[in-house]
Design a protein with these regions (language model features):
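A generic hydrophobic-segment detector
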Residues: 1, 141-143
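Sec-dependent bacterial lipoprotein signal peptides
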Residues: 1-16
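Acidic (Asp/Glu) and glycine-rich low-complexity loops/linkers
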Residues: 8, 18-120, 124-140, 150-160, ...
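Structural signal for glycine-centered tight turns and loop->strand junctions in beta-sheet-rich domains
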Residues: 42, 58-60, 82, 122, ...
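A residue-level signal for conserved active-site and pocket-lining positions in enzyme catalytic cores
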Residues: 48, 76, 116, 142, ...
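Beta-strand-rich extracellular passenger or scaffold domains
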Residues: 119-127, 146-148, 166-168, 186, ...
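Short, surface-exposed interaction patches in beta-rich subdomains
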Residues: 166-263
């Protein structure tokens, strides 16, 4: 009797395993490229494991590069001014179950965008930088990554949370505000007139290669900030937060311990 019961249980487990395997999609090694027509957009958002490569250009062109058996599930559409990139659910309404590695990309050429958002392991790469007179907002969360160089704008707002990473090089802006929380990481270099850095909950901001005339730096709950102040620095820490700074600012206001100069 026990033997029969055990065999029945094993049969059920094997059957269930087969069902799971049948539901999973193994990415093909045959890649295709497909052009996509979209309405006008001012920002880009990727919310699944799809990489977006953005190139600033005079004209808009969007194409998908994906395994042939994943192509139909890659969705690119403009909503509320954002170009949304994601994997569509399967026929049952469940999240797509992809078993194996793949290099699905959405390649976007367009005039200057002002919002970049990456989440759920999605990545955004700025292929040739970003130049605009307005405000640029860059956000990453849930293991999303954003990286780029040669970024020029009036105001730059950066936010990384939940293990999101943002890496920007050779930034030029008038005002910069960077926030990192919940193990989010921000790395930024360049120049700015004023900069404000806020790190909390093990967030990390590495900005000692960004020279700013005026700097405000705050770190709390094991957050870390490194910065470079030219003329003035206001710094505060709490709950094991740390602020480190380069430069020789004449105006220094330190409101707590945990602030130190970098040689």
């Amino acid at each position: 009797m026990k033997t029969t019961l055990i065999l029945s249980m094993l049969a059920g487990m094997i059957s269930q395993s087969c069902i799971v395997s049948q539901d999973a999609i193994v990415p093909s090694e045959n890649y295709l490229t497909q052009q996509v027509n979209v309405e006008a957009f001012d920002g880009i958002k990727t919310s699944t494991a799809i990489d977006v490569v953005y190139t600033q250009a005079d004209r808009t062109a969007v194409e998908i590069y994906a395994p042939d058996n994943l192509m139909e599930y890659v969705k690119v559409e403009s909503r509320d001014g954002l170009l949304n990139v994601y994997f569509e659910s399967d026929e049952t309404g469940k999240s797509l179950n992809i078993r194996g590695n793949h290099k699905t990309q959405v390649r976007v050429s367009a005039p200057a965008v002002h919002t970049l958002q990456a989440s759920s392991a999605g990545d955004i790469v700025l292929a040739n930088g970003l130049k605009t007179d307005g405000c640029v907002r860059i956000e990453s969360s849930s293991s999303g990554d954003i990286e780029g160089a040669d970024i020029s704008c009036e105001e730059l707002k950066i936010q990384a949370s939940s293990a999101g990473d943002i890496e920007l090089e050779r930034v030029e802006c008038s005002s910069l505000h960077a926030e990192a929380s919940s193990s989010g990481d921000v790395s930024v270099s360049g120049v700015a007139r004023s900069a404000k850095f806020e790190a909390s909950s093990a967030g990390d901001i590495d900005a000692d290669e960004l020279k700013a005339e005026e700097v405000i730096a705050k770190a709390s709950s094991a957050g870390d900030v490194s910065c470079h102040a030219v003329a003035s620095l206001e710094a505060s820490t709490s709950s094991a937060g740390n602020v480190r700074y380069k430069g020789n600012p004449k105006d220094i206001r330190i409101h707590s311990k945990g602030v130190q100069k970098i040689d």
